[in-house]
Amino acid sequence: MGEVEISARAYGKMCLHASRYPHAAVNGLLLAPATRSGECLCLTDCVPLFHSHLALSVMLEVALNQVDVWATQAGLVVAGYYHANAVLDDQSPGPLALKIAGRIAEFFPNAVLIMLDNKKLVTWPRVPPVIVLENQGLQWVPKDKNLVMWRDWEESRQMVGALLEGRAHQHLVDFDCHLDDIRQDWTNQRLNTQITQWSGSTDGHA
């Protein structure tokens, strides 16, 4: 499999999701423009799913269908899955993570599974707190770190630190929140705007 690039938006929303619910397992879907085999997979966005209903298949089906429709309209595909375990020192994908990632890989063979490393998930991490896995046959194995690219790691690091200090994670909406109150926006356009504005303020353009 080829290179994977993680955007500031995708990385930021994963971290904010885990930070909003630090004592719970959280998960979500990774989105990317459709690519041909061998091309760089650019993870441009993510959709936070659950923090309390992770194992409820009915809820998952509803979420997957809605995200797939929305992503298609935006010219994107569901290209992966992210998961943070509730236990601080557990970075291994459990049965649920493997099941959902495997299902995504059935439709998108180049899909990746990202496990968040809770120990490294601090306001100002020195290294990316993520473990990227790829599907090889029937197993998910760590991807060669030389093939995991960052559009701008330092910018992503600074942005997430600033957002966390500003408590932006309190405004993140996952699908659980949306199911409790359908007025809440699981696409997180408000947060997307904050991320875009932050990036624009650092490089001179939005």
From Swiss-Prot:
CDD domains: MPN_UPF0172
Molecular function GO labels: membrane insertase activity
Membrane topology: Peripheral membrane protein
BP-aspect Gene Ontology terms: protein insertion into ER membrane by stop-transfer membrane-anchor sequence; tail-anchored membrane protein insertion into ER membrane
A Pfam family recorded for this sequence: UPF0172
Ranges in coiled-coil conformation: none
Localisation: Endoplasmic reticulum membrane
Primary localization class, coarse: endoplasmic reticulum
Domain of life: Eukaryota
GO cellular component, one term: EMC complex
Quaternary structure annotation from Swiss-Prot or TrEMBL: Component of the ER membrane protein complex (EMC). EMC8 and EMC9 are mutually exclusive subunits of the EMC complex.
Family to which this protein belongs: Belongs to the EMC8/EMC9 family.
Function comment: Part of the endoplasmic reticulum membrane protein complex (EMC) that enables the energy-independent insertion into endoplasmic reticulum membranes of newly synthesized membrane proteins. Preferentially accommodates proteins with transmembrane domains that are weakly hydrophobic or contain destabilizing features such as charged and aromatic residues. Involved in the cotranslational insertion of multi-pass membrane proteins in which stop-transfer membrane-anchor sequences become ER membrane spanning helices.
Protein known as: ER membrane protein complex subunit 9
Phylogenetic placement of the source organism: Eukaryota, Metazoa, Chordata, Craniata, Vertebrata
Gene designation per UniProt: Emc9
